Regions:
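Conserved NTP-donor binding/palm subdomain of two-metal-ion nucleotidyltransferases/polymerases, i.e.
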Residues: 1-111, 117-378
Length: 378
């Protein structure tokens, strides 16, 4: 771990007293922003009375206030939509976390707002959104309700709210479709719990399901920004008395998410001192790693959280040669409907898009393999 990250983690840890100066305040701020932790850093530093240079402190304060106001506006718009929907909605990730486990609306940036609806309710909700002025680049009736392509993004002119409408918990981003069918969606809906978004009623995932979902999401992004790991830290800290670790392990096995859960919990404990029972980590710890997972694990232990690093992990967990070939092909050459969902392109470019994406992904894969460590630390 580099000194700058180490210093940031000390500031974020309420039990650690800061006794040294940072390597460089500009570097601390830049790193915290890249990791999505700058708002948390600002509030934690204020609580600890850390002497931040005045111009930097003022800049952090202004960014925090702006983010707080933006988040409130987004949540107010989401609350209005929830009142318009007659069907149950599960609010996911950032919006759910800000409304439950975070103590302050300004501590975390909201990107897309993710909501989960039942597949049968998608046409009705799509119609309501359209009537309220929200538009999607893709037509709902052109989508097959599957585990492969299972979401639509809606926006509205002049609104900061970008709504990501899901009808399955696992997003369409490759290669997550491989284990999407293992997720018991009926169980998620049955065990969802009430949530207030401002003054509107909604649902959120039960704590054990939320932990699994956040772990899967963080793995999908190869842990490239630590705010995803901090979300996991927050869920565990907030629910210390309520988390059923035995249930979490059972569901992780059933949903085939033991690997993502292990690496997410390990990173959270390693970086933020999260209270994760050692017996749980030992139960989840991979016993037989393939070459890809050994490289993945070795890079994580070196603090190298690269984009698309998760491909190595996923590749190792595919059982047959035939499925591995399919995985490589689908990763490099996604279906055209998925490509149009992933890329903002002009009509005239469509015939070249598949090759453009394939070459870009191939370069990323070669970059991963080219920089892999020679020895693996288990």
């Amino acid at each position: 771990m580099n000194k700058t990250l180490g210093y940031i983690f000390q500031i974020l840890n309420p039990c650690v007293e800061i006794t040294v100066s940072p390597p460089s305040w500009p570097e601390v701020i830049s790193t915290s922003q890249n990791e999505g932790l700058s708002f948390l850093l600002y509030r934690s530093a204020i609580k600890k009375n850390i002497d931040i240079p005045f111009p930097i402190k003022q800049s952090l304060k202004q960014e925090y206030i702006y983010n707080w106001g933006r988040n409130i506006r987004i949540l107010e718009e989401l609350a209005a939509l929830l009142r318009a929907f007659e069907d149950p909605v599960i609010v996911l990730k950032g919006a759910a976390l800000l409304s439950s486990v975070y103590e302050d609306f300004g501590l975390r940036m909201l990107g897309d707002v993710d909501i989960l609806v039942k597949p049968a309710d998608v046409p009705k909700i799509d119609k309501i959104l359209s009537q309220l002025g929200y538009q999607s680049d893709h037509k709902q009736d052109a989508y097959y309700v599957t585990n492969y392509l299972n979401s639509l993004v809606y926006g509205k002119n002049g609104s900061p709210l970008l709504l990501h409408l899901h009808w399955h918990l696992i997003n369409n981003a490759l290669p997550n479709y491989i284990y999407a069918e293992k997720i018991n969606m009926d169980k998620l809906w049955k065990e969802a719990i009430p949530l207030k978004i401002r003054e509107s009623d909604a649902l959120c995932l039960a704590p054990h399901h939320q932990l699994l979902h956040l772990s899967e999401h963080a793995m999908k992004h190869s842990y490239n920004t630590l705010i995803h790991v901090w979300d996991i830290h927050q869920i565990i800290n907030h629910g210390k008395e309520k988390l059923d670790w035995e249930m979490i392990c059972v569901e992780a096995e059933e949903f085939q998410l033991k690997g993502p859960l292990f690496y997410s919990l390990w990173l959270s404990k390693e970086y933020f001192g999260t209270s994760v029972p050692q017996g749980i980590l030992e139960f989840l710890r991979p016993r037989h790693k393939g070459v890809g997972e050994k490289i993945f694990s070795g890079l994580l232990r070196q603090g190298k959280r690269r984009e698309k690093l998760c491909w190595l992990f996923y590749f190792s967990h595919i059982s047959t040669v035939q499925k591995k070939i399919k995985f490589v092909f689908r990763t490099l050459f996604p279906p055209r409907d998925v490509l149009s969902h992933m890329e903002d392109i002009e009509n005239g470019e469509k015939s070249f898009l598949i090759w453009k994406v394939a070459l870009r992904r191939l370069r990323k894969a070669l970059r991963l393999l080219g920089k892999a460590p020679q020895e693996y630390d288990d």
